[in-house]
Amino acid sequence: MNQQDIEQVVKAVLLKMKDSSQPASTVHEMGVFASLDDAVAAAKRAQQGLKSVAMRQLAIHAIREAGEKHARELAELAVSETGMGRVDDKFAKNVAQARGTPGVECLSPQVLTGDNGLTLIENAPWGVVASVTPSTNPAATVINNAISLIAAGNSVVFAPHPAAKKVSQRAITLLNQAVVAAGGPENLLVTVANPDIETAQRLFKYPGIGLLVVTGGEAVVDAARKHTNKRLIAAGAGNPPVVVDETADLPRAAQSIVKGASFDNNIICADEKVLIVVDSVADELMRLMEGQHAVKLTAAQAEQLQPVLLKNIDERGKGTVSRDWVGRDAGKIAAAIGLNVPDQTRLLFVETPANHPFAVTEMMMPVLPVVRVANVEEAIALAVQLEGGCHHTAAMHSRNIDNMNQMANAIDTSIFVKNGPCIAGLGLGGEGWTTMTITTPTGEGVTSARTFVRLRRCVLVDAFRIV
């Protein structure tokens, strides 16, 4: 028999092995259920098949291949459905999650021995985990969470943002199909056909689900905190500042800042949101940025743009971002005030004071405020202020070790990038693993399978110490 014949036999056997007590059949595609109860029941049954580490490895390998194979399809669908972001950048995110999310290799048991015997500490699954995913990074978050949670031995009930339900459901279906085709359990990843706020709130309290993973903005994290007493791992908002001092490699800094601040139209919470630059190099840095497909706005143009992009500005200068403009292309934003920019424009930037609404608010669009300061000490202090205690991400461009050390200590973020774009902290151009769930509100930071296990201790007294 050739490989194709074997695959056909495996599929036929799997079909015969389906449990006749399986809940109401999925709607639309594999893993998408008409009701939440049916989805959770299917995920519970599927999770029983993950007790074997070999099965987890098989499922993860299939998910990696499917995630990469369908990365562009999912990127195009995400932009088409949500209107946010850039296809090429979403493609890069999807591929990065498929390749760079750690699997079972990052889970190691601990063994302690001593005069009183042996203690074994194992990584146990939670069982069925609920995952709330955003409209900004829909497919990438599904791929990332699927790998991390399955590696930890869990099945997943996804609650995708309603504005990205089609692409989220498509991703869930494609990954499920790949797992089943490889010989894994059906419905390791499930969701409902019509996700909404009520579905998410039910998941926050659903019996038998012990862990909630929430990736999104302040509102959804606050809602999860209010509506659940379950273990919560939450990824929230950020307002990442990037500081450039007088010692920086300015051409490199300009390239990195434009790349990072424009990546996927700035809808990743880890993207650069405000640039703080020492006055002596500010003009040259901005000139170099204009050579990287960035367009500088005048103060008058920024004044025109502000009421289009922000509403309800409070006494601190923080506004409510208009959802109509989140993640939109720089050219479309410029056109809103009658400004024509070159087609290849990736970023708009404008000089502002430190208290300007563009600097204070997490904009999540390719509009970057630039604030001049007298020296690096002032720059670092302002970066801490504008980061706002989110403890998310920050960056610095400098060739002075003392300056970088000073900012690293002061900024207190989960990710701090030196001499590169902020996305390098997520494995996109930097070393280390990747994730779409950066859990700053609950303190886990850059998540992996290790984040999603329960530690269990087993003790044998007065035995099995062999030295």
UniProtKB/Swiss-Prot annotation:
Stated name of the protein: Acetaldehyde dehydrogenase (acetylating) EutE
Positions of the UniProt region annotated as Targets protein to the BMC: 1-19
pH dependence per the UniProt record: Optimum pH is 6.5 for acetyl-CoA reductase and 7.5 for acetaldehyde dehydrogenase activities.
Pfam family of the protein (one): Aldedh
Manganese among keywords: no
InterPro entries: Acetald_propionald_DH-rel (IPR012408), Ald_DH/histidinol_DH (IPR016161), Ald_DH_C (IPR016163), Ald_DH_N (IPR016162), Aldehyde_DH_dom (IPR015590)
Annotated pathway: Amine and polyamine degradation; ethanolamine degradation
Any one of the GO CC terms: bacterial microcompartment
Disruption phenotype: Can use ethanolamine (EA) as a nitrogen source but not as a carbon source. Slightly attenuated in a mouse model of infection. No aerobic growth on EA supplemented with cobalamin (vitamin B12). A non-polar deletion mutant does not grow on EA between pH 5.5 and pH 8.5, releases increased amounts of acetaldehyde on EA plus vitamin B12. A deletion allows growth on acetate, suggesting BMC assembly or maintenance is impaired.
Induction: Part of the 17-gene eut operon transcribed from a single promoter, induced by ethanolamine and adenosylcobalamin (AdoCbl, vitamin B12).
Top-level taxon of the source organism: Bacteria
Keywords: Bacterial microcompartment, NAD, Oxidoreductase, Virulence
Enzyme Commission (EC) number: 1.2.1.10
Catalyzed reactions per annotation: acetaldehyde + NAD(+) + CoA = acetyl-CoA + NADH + H(+)
MF-aspect GO terms: acetaldehyde dehydrogenase (acetylating) activity
Practical applications according to UniProt: Has been used to coproduce acetaldehyde and hydrogen in E.coli.
EC category: oxidoreductase
Location(s) in or outside the cell: Bacterial microcompartment
Gene: eutE
UniProt similarity note: Belongs to the EutE/PduP family.
Organism of provenance: Salmonella typhimurium (strain LT2 / SGSC1412 / ATCC 700720)
